[in-house]
Amino acid sequence: MTIDDRKIKILQAIINDYIHTGDPVGSRTIAKKYNLGVGSATIRNEMADLEDMGYLEQPHASSGRVPSNKGYRLYVDSLMENQLLTPEENLKIKQYIIDTAMLEVDKIVRQTSSLLSELTNLTCVIQTPSVNKSFIKSLQLMKVDSTTLVSVIITDAGVMKNHIIRVNSTPTIEELNKINAVINRRLVNLCIEQINLQVINQLKEDLQGYDELFNALLTPLYETLKNAADSPDLIMEGATNIFNYPEYNDIEKAKEMLSLLNDKESLRDLLKTNKDITIRIGEENYKPQAKDCSIIAAEYSFGDRPIGTIGLIGPKRIDYSKVISIMAEIVKELNNILNNQSK
């Protein structure tokens, strides 16, 4: 059996209605609310065919139909229409651009997560920038007092790492300028993951005569490398939003969702994407705790290099068209903000 134009229009109407009401949809509802040019008896027969084809499900014998995972997938891939942002949504995004223009990267990411959660009424999870793929833009030693220095490591993505260094006696300002020049000549434009024992030994040769300072400098370098090897952190906003949907009045579904939101490793796996926007529905999420939800994920980038991922988590009946429009616009602006900061 093939899915013809009439079945497609009926399926589209059912999914749109279910997304906005959360109630199983009957043939009379479609006949009354949508001008499809056919009566409820014809719609009922077509709905039975759509169920046989796997696009609809009937949760209870006496109820209407709801979309299946297969139905949602067809809807997302082929049937949903682009939705423009409202003036209020555009205004909030413009304010976000202004508010984050001069912030550090971690604060920008946190505000991004908060805005996405607010505008979509979903749970937002953002993977913070991955340091190991970043390049060192600057490493500066600055004198605090006669026995204390602070090292400031800045990556090309704007991530800053500060470390206090204790020595018996700090170099003079003139010596410090020379040392900074040597360090930056050796390390600037190196990817964090390229800093290996060979590079460290070369730096040691460059800093002959400053053995105490070199040994002290190893600590912040080691910490930076260790942080790079660690899994990127996750920022979550709107964790309770998802429980406003009646689907999660079911205690078992609520437990599964709580389990997922507390499982950082699973969340990192589910956020993986190599596309502008990835949509996974139900069992496409390949994690048992996520089988009843949808996850929309997108990369954000510094230049052409992806540095993190944004994910929105909600029930399968989320308003895909609206959410995708909001996600695409905010990711675009986030990329612009990060790239403008580097100039």
From Swiss-Prot:
The keyword Phosphoprotein does not apply. GO terms for molecular function: DNA binding. InterPro entries: GAF-like_dom_sf, HrcA, HrcA_C, WH-like_DNA-bd_sf, WH_DNA-bd_sf, WHTH_transcript_rep_HrcA_IDD. The gene is hrcA. It comes from the Bacteria. The keyword rRNA-binding does not apply. Belongs to the HrcA family. Keywords: Repressor, Stress response, Transcription, Transcription regulation. Gene3D superfamilies: 3.30.450.40, Heat-inducible transcription repressor hrca homolog, domain 3 (3.30.390.60), Winged helix-like DNA-binding domain superfamily/Winged helix DNA-binding domain (1.10.10.10). One of its GO terms (biological process) is negative regulation of DNA-templated transcription. This is Heat-inducible transcription repressor HrcA. Negative regulator of class I heat shock genes (grpE-dnaK-dnaJ and groELS operons). Prevents heat-shock induction of these operons.
